[in-house]
Amino acid sequence: MPSDRTHIIWDNSNIFISGRSVCDKLERKSAAFRINFESLVDLAANNRTIEQVFCVGSVPPPTDAVWGHIEKKTGKKPELYERGAESGKEQAVDQALQTRMLRLGYDFDPPETLVLLSGDGSGADQGVGFFSDIKRLHKFGWNIEVMSWKDHCNRAMRTWAEQNGLFVPLDDFYGSVTFLQGLRNAKPLDLSKRPAKV
């Protein structure tokens, strides 16, 4: 039986770029679109103990208050992997994150809960990528939760998460996990609306 500790694997570029597209449809102000990192972390944790956070993408600087928020909640500094501007699809950084994710299956016994903040299901037909790796961790007994924007999550990964773990659509929390710089503040996060695994 997995414990209540939560490990957050976060592909911020995927969440940000997809979220900006959602913003363009809802508010047509994508240039001002920002992620409210603290609310996103709180949504992922859902009042559970955060064991660790691994984040890749265009992330705030290590001194940013969001990382202090995570450190305060966990007692640990999150691991941040900045994507290089010239790395094309930046697959090497994704692979580094996936390696960290797979190590969880060996390093934690009993299994715990993994929250994947990404809708990237690429590579699954070759047995690689985030989708393949969450299935591997699930075989080890891990609880799996996928948080992504509905229309920007790989369809097969979303269906798998709904059937084998939990899918949390970020769209349902759009006003809380986003803000428009200089135009709209984030609303308070209401965790009572977050789906939970039964």
Where does each model-flagged region fall?
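Fold-independent oxyanion-binding glycine-rich loops
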Residues: 12, 119, 170
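Short, aromatic/basic amphipathic alpha-helical patches
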Residues: 65-75, 130-134, 154-164
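Acidic, low-complexity intrinsically disordered regions
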Residues: 124-133, 137-140, 170-171
